[in-house]
Curated annotation (Swiss-Prot):
InterPro entries: T_IF-3_C_sf (IPR036788), T_IF-3_N_sf (IPR036787), Translation_initiation_fac3_CS (IPR019813), Translation_initiation_fac_3 (IPR001288), Translation_initiation_fac_3_C (IPR019815), Translation_initiation_fac_3_N (IPR019814). It is found in: Cytoplasm. It holds the Pfam family IF3_C. One of its GO terms (molecular function) is translation initiation factor activity. It comes from Helicobacter pylori (strain J99 / ATCC 700824). Residues 172-182 have a biased composition (Basic and acidic residues). This is Translation initiation factor IF-3. The gene is infC. The keyword Transmembrane helix does not apply. Residues 172-203 are annotated as: Disordered. Keywords: Cytoplasm, Initiation factor, Protein biosynthesis. Belongs to the IF-3 family.
């Protein structure tokens, strides 16, 4: 907020204003000149809060301190809004279990670092016509990730790949666990195949 965006001190000129203090003080309905005098006596600023109110509302405050704190809050909020990092892990339909274990180990490390993980199974030859083999691999992965991550929506077929995004589980209070399980039933092979058939029907 800049001084150009608000009216304060001598720029406020109303016959009557509702004047309040920064700590809840109520000075009542007085002229803007009287309100400014109160602010000056306290070594503070008179700031117009609501020009549309009847009468307009003004607040006695340290405007520079208010602006500094407001800008600080905005900067802190931007720092918290970190871009989500997505790690991609490729698999094949013929992958051995020990290789899945190795890749899932790294995926779990990414999840623990608050990253999202996208598993992509490569479909070769006729596999691209039927993604069941790819879904089987993803389902095996899901059972190994379910204690740490939640699948985002359902698997997607993308050309020669079938993919599934996993995101870190949100920390929930114990009392909400039962409700969460009821509202979010675990994925299973039947659900996955239903989703695949539904996607084919849409095509």
């Amino acid at each position: 907020m800049s001084r150009n965006e608000v009216l304060l001190n001598g720029d406020i000129n109303f016959k009557e204003v509702r004047c309040v203090g920064d700590n809840g003080e109520v000075y009542g309905i007085i002229s803007s000149k009287e309100a400014l005098k109160i602010a000056q006596n306290l070594g503070l600023d008179l700031v117009l809060i609501s020009a549309s109110a009847k009468p307009p509302v003004c607040k006695v405050m340290d405007y520079n301190k208010f602006r500094y704190q407001n800008e600080k809050k905005i900067k802190e909020a931007k720092k918290k809004q970190k871009q989500i990092e997505i790690k991609e892990i490729k698999l094949s339909t013929q992958i051995a279990q020990n290789d899945i274990n190795y890749k899932v180990k790294h995926a779990r490390e990414f999840i623990e670092s608050n990253k999202h993980v996208k598993f992509k199974v490569v479909l070769k030859g006729r596999e691209s016509q039927n993604s069941k083999a790819g879904l089987d691999v993803l389902f095996r992965v899901q059972t190994m990730m379910q204690d740490l991550a939640n699948p985002e929506k359902e698997p997607k077929t993308e050309g020669r790949f079938v993919s599934w995004m996993f995101v870190p589980k949100a920390k929930e209070a114990p009392k909400n666990e039962k409700k969460t399980k009821e509202n979010n039933p675990p994925f299973n092979r039947i659900n996955l195949m239903k989703g695949e058939n539904h996607a084919k029907n849409e095509d």
